[in-house]
Protein backbone atom coordinates (compact mmCIF):
# COMPACT_ATOMS: atom_id res chain seq x y z
CA UNK A 1 0.00 0.00 0.00
CA UNK A 2 1.31 3.44 -0.94
CA UNK A 3 -0.61 6.55 0.20
CA UNK A 4 -3.89 4.68 0.10
CA UNK A 5 -3.15 3.08 -3.27
CA UNK A 6 -3.39 -0.71 -3.38
CA UNK A 7 -1.87 -3.29 -5.71
CA UNK A 8 -2.01 -7.06 -5.54
CA UNK A 9 -3.73 -10.12 -6.94
CA UNK A 10 -6.01 -12.99 -6.05
CA UNK A 11 -6.01 -16.57 -7.20
CA UNK A 12 -8.57 -18.12 -9.52
CA UNK A 13 -8.33 -21.53 -7.88
CA UNK A 14 -9.93 -23.55 -10.68
CA UNK A 15 -7.17 -22.54 -13.11
CA UNK A 16 -4.46 -21.82 -10.53
CA UNK A 17 -3.89 -18.42 -12.11
CA UNK A 18 -3.53 -14.96 -10.63
CA UNK A 19 -5.83 -12.04 -11.38
CA UNK A 20 -4.25 -8.63 -10.86
CA UNK A 21 -5.87 -5.97 -8.69
CA UNK A 22 -5.40 -2.23 -8.28
CA UNK A 23 -7.36 0.17 -6.12
CA UNK A 24 -7.47 2.39 -3.09
CA UNK A 25 -8.36 2.33 0.59
CA UNK A 26 -9.93 5.14 2.61
CA UNK A 27 -10.58 4.36 6.24
CA UNK A 28 -12.33 0.99 6.22
CA UNK A 29 -13.57 1.37 2.65
CA UNK A 30 -11.84 -0.40 -0.22
CA UNK A 31 -12.41 -0.19 -3.97
CA UNK A 32 -10.53 -2.57 -6.26
CA UNK A 33 -10.37 -3.01 -10.02
CA UNK A 34 -9.86 -6.54 -11.32
CA UNK A 35 -7.68 -6.70 -14.45
CA UNK A 36 -7.60 -9.38 -17.14
CA UNK A 37 -4.99 -8.92 -19.86
CA UNK A 38 -4.49 -5.39 -18.57
CA UNK A 39 -8.15 -4.41 -18.98
CA UNK A 40 -10.81 -3.91 -16.27
CA UNK A 41 -12.93 -7.03 -15.84
CA UNK A 42 -14.75 -6.24 -12.62
CA UNK A 43 -14.88 -4.09 -9.51
CA UNK A 44 -14.82 -4.94 -5.81
CA UNK A 45 -16.36 -2.40 -3.45
CA UNK A 46 -16.63 -3.11 0.24
CA UNK A 47 -15.46 -2.59 3.80
CA UNK A 48 -12.93 -4.08 6.19
CA UNK A 49 -14.33 -5.46 9.44
CA UNK A 50 -12.35 -6.47 12.53
CA UNK A 51 -15.14 -7.16 15.03
CA UNK A 52 -14.85 -10.96 15.26
CA UNK A 53 -12.65 -11.90 12.31
CA UNK A 54 -10.56 -9.76 9.98
CA UNK A 55 -12.55 -9.74 6.78
CA UNK A 56 -13.32 -7.77 3.62
CA UNK A 57 -16.87 -7.95 2.30
CA UNK A 58 -19.06 -6.11 -0.14
CA UNK A 59 -20.11 -6.45 -3.78
CA UNK A 60 -18.35 -7.42 -7.00
CA UNK A 61 -19.69 -5.94 -10.25
CA UNK A 62 -18.58 -6.89 -13.74
CA UNK A 63 -17.10 -4.29 -16.08
CA UNK A 64 -20.36 -3.51 -17.89
CA UNK A 65 -22.28 -3.16 -14.62
CA UNK A 66 -24.88 -5.80 -15.52
CA UNK A 67 -23.99 -8.43 -12.92
CA UNK A 68 -23.40 -7.89 -9.21
CA UNK A 69 -22.56 -10.51 -6.59
CA UNK A 70 -21.97 -10.26 -2.86
CA UNK A 71 -18.57 -11.46 -1.63
CA UNK A 72 -16.93 -12.10 1.73
CA UNK A 73 -13.25 -12.85 2.35
CA UNK A 74 -11.69 -13.71 5.70
CA UNK A 75 -8.02 -13.42 6.65
CA UNK A 76 -6.60 -16.94 7.02
CA UNK A 77 -2.87 -16.22 7.26
CA UNK A 78 -0.31 -13.44 7.00
CA UNK A 79 2.54 -13.13 4.53
CA UNK A 80 6.19 -12.74 5.52
CA UNK A 81 6.69 -10.13 2.79
CA UNK A 82 5.23 -6.65 2.48
CA UNK A 83 5.53 -6.61 -1.34
CA UNK A 84 3.14 -8.31 -3.76
CA UNK A 85 6.05 -8.49 -6.21
CA UNK A 86 8.05 -10.76 -3.89
CA UNK A 87 5.74 -12.86 -1.73
CA UNK A 88 8.31 -15.56 -0.93
CA UNK A 89 10.80 -13.09 0.49
CA UNK A 90 13.09 -15.64 2.16
CA UNK A 91 13.45 -17.79 -0.96
CA UNK A 92 16.03 -17.14 -3.64
CA UNK A 93 14.31 -16.75 -7.00
CA UNK A 94 11.07 -15.25 -8.21
CA UNK A 95 7.58 -16.05 -6.97
CA UNK A 96 6.74 -17.49 -10.40
CA UNK A 97 9.71 -19.86 -10.21
CA UNK A 98 8.74 -21.12 -6.76
CA UNK A 99 5.12 -21.64 -7.80
CA UNK A 100 6.17 -23.33 -11.04
CA UNK A 101 8.28 -25.78 -9.04
CA UNK A 102 5.43 -26.50 -6.63
CA UNK A 103 3.12 -27.03 -9.61
CA UNK A 104 5.60 -29.58 -10.97
CA UNK A 105 5.71 -31.29 -7.56
CA UNK A 106 1.92 -31.46 -7.50
CA UNK A 107 1.62 -32.76 -11.07
CA UNK A 108 4.39 -35.33 -10.62
CA UNK A 109 2.81 -36.76 -7.46
CA UNK A 110 -0.66 -36.99 -9.01
CA UNK A 111 0.73 -38.62 -12.18
CA UNK A 112 2.99 -41.00 -10.27
CA UNK A 113 6.26 -39.65 -11.65
CA UNK A 114 8.41 -41.42 -9.08
CA UNK A 115 11.77 -40.55 -10.64
CA UNK A 116 11.13 -36.81 -10.76
CA UNK A 117 9.91 -36.68 -7.16
CA UNK A 118 12.81 -38.85 -5.96
CA UNK A 119 15.26 -36.48 -7.67
CA UNK A 120 13.79 -33.40 -5.99
CA UNK A 121 13.75 -34.34 -2.30
CA UNK A 122 16.12 -33.27 0.46
CA UNK A 123 17.23 -36.52 2.16
CA UNK A 124 16.81 -37.85 4.76
CA UNK A 125 13.09 -37.07 5.03
CA UNK A 126 10.50 -38.34 7.52
CA UNK A 127 7.22 -39.74 6.22
CA UNK A 128 4.36 -41.99 7.24
CA UNK A 129 3.78 -45.40 5.70
CA UNK A 130 0.54 -47.39 5.66
CA UNK A 131 -1.20 -47.66 9.07
CA UNK A 132 0.55 -44.51 10.29
CA UNK A 133 3.98 -46.04 10.78
CA UNK A 134 6.67 -43.33 10.77
CA UNK A 135 9.80 -43.94 8.73
CA UNK A 136 12.86 -42.04 7.53
CA UNK A 137 13.57 -42.21 3.80
CA UNK A 138 17.31 -41.92 3.30
CA UNK A 139 17.72 -41.97 -0.47
CA UNK A 140 16.03 -42.03 -3.89
CA UNK A 141 15.86 -45.83 -4.00
CA UNK A 142 13.87 -46.00 -0.76
CA UNK A 143 11.57 -43.21 -1.92
CA UNK A 144 10.73 -45.01 -5.17
CA UNK A 145 10.19 -48.34 -3.38
CA UNK A 146 7.74 -46.73 -0.94
CA UNK A 147 6.20 -44.18 -3.31
CA UNK A 148 2.71 -45.68 -3.39
CA UNK A 149 2.56 -45.98 0.40
CA UNK A 150 3.73 -42.40 0.88
CA UNK A 151 1.59 -40.83 -1.83
CA UNK A 152 -1.56 -42.83 -1.20
CA UNK A 153 -4.98 -42.09 -2.69
CA UNK A 154 -6.25 -39.88 0.14
CA UNK A 155 -3.03 -37.86 0.25
CA UNK A 156 -3.07 -37.39 -3.52
CA UNK A 157 -6.61 -36.06 -3.17
CA UNK A 158 -5.44 -33.38 -0.73
CA UNK A 159 -2.57 -32.45 -3.04
CA UNK A 160 -4.86 -32.27 -6.07
CA UNK A 161 -7.27 -29.95 -4.24
CA UNK A 162 -4.51 -27.54 -3.12
CA UNK A 163 -3.69 -24.41 -5.10
CA UNK A 164 -0.12 -23.35 -5.91
CA UNK A 165 -0.91 -19.60 -6.06
CA UNK A 166 -0.06 -17.26 -3.18
CA UNK A 167 1.05 -20.01 -0.81
CA UNK A 168 1.86 -19.53 2.88
CA UNK A 169 5.57 -19.16 3.63
CA UNK A 170 7.94 -18.55 6.52
CA UNK A 171 11.52 -19.34 7.55
CA UNK A 172 10.83 -23.04 6.89
CA UNK A 173 10.01 -22.42 3.24
CA UNK A 174 6.80 -22.47 1.20
CA UNK A 175 3.95 -24.85 1.94
CA UNK A 176 1.24 -26.38 -0.21
CA UNK A 177 -2.26 -26.40 1.27
CA UNK A 178 -2.20 -26.68 5.05
CA UNK A 179 1.39 -27.89 5.16
CA UNK A 180 1.03 -31.16 3.25
CA UNK A 181 4.19 -30.39 1.22
CA UNK A 182 7.01 -27.96 1.99
CA UNK A 183 9.66 -26.72 -0.43
CA UNK A 184 12.76 -24.57 -0.06
CA UNK A 185 15.93 -23.73 -1.94
CA UNK A 186 18.50 -26.46 -2.37
CA UNK A 187 21.25 -26.21 0.30
CA UNK A 188 23.86 -25.14 -2.24
CA UNK A 189 21.73 -22.34 -3.74
CA UNK A 190 23.27 -18.91 -4.28
CA UNK A 191 21.75 -15.71 -5.63
CA UNK A 192 23.13 -16.49 -9.09
CA UNK A 193 22.63 -20.26 -9.14
CA UNK A 194 19.73 -21.80 -7.27
CA UNK A 195 17.13 -24.53 -7.29
CA UNK A 196 14.26 -25.90 -5.25
CA UNK A 197 13.69 -29.11 -3.34
CA UNK A 198 10.97 -30.82 -1.28
CA UNK A 199 11.88 -30.52 2.40
CA UNK A 200 8.82 -32.01 4.13
CA UNK A 201 6.09 -34.51 3.25
CA UNK A 202 3.25 -34.46 5.78
CA UNK A 203 1.18 -37.38 4.60
Roles of regions detected by a PLM:
Residues 1-52, 56-57, 67-74, 86:
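Central antiparallel beta-sheet cores of small beta-barrel/beta-sandwich binding domains
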Residues 43-63, 143-203:
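Exposed beta-sheet edge and beta->alpha loop/turn motif
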Residues 78-107:
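Short, low-complexity N-terminal intrinsically disordered segments enriched in polar/charged residues
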Residues 113-124:
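Short, well-ordered alpha-helical segments enriched in acidic and aromatic residues
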Residues 124-126, 203:
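Solvent-exposed loop/turn segments at secondary-structure junctions
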Residues 127-133:
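A short gly/proline-enriched turn/hairpin at secondary-structure junctions
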Residues 133-146:
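A solvent-exposed, acidic/Ser-Thr-rich amphipathic alpha-helical stretch
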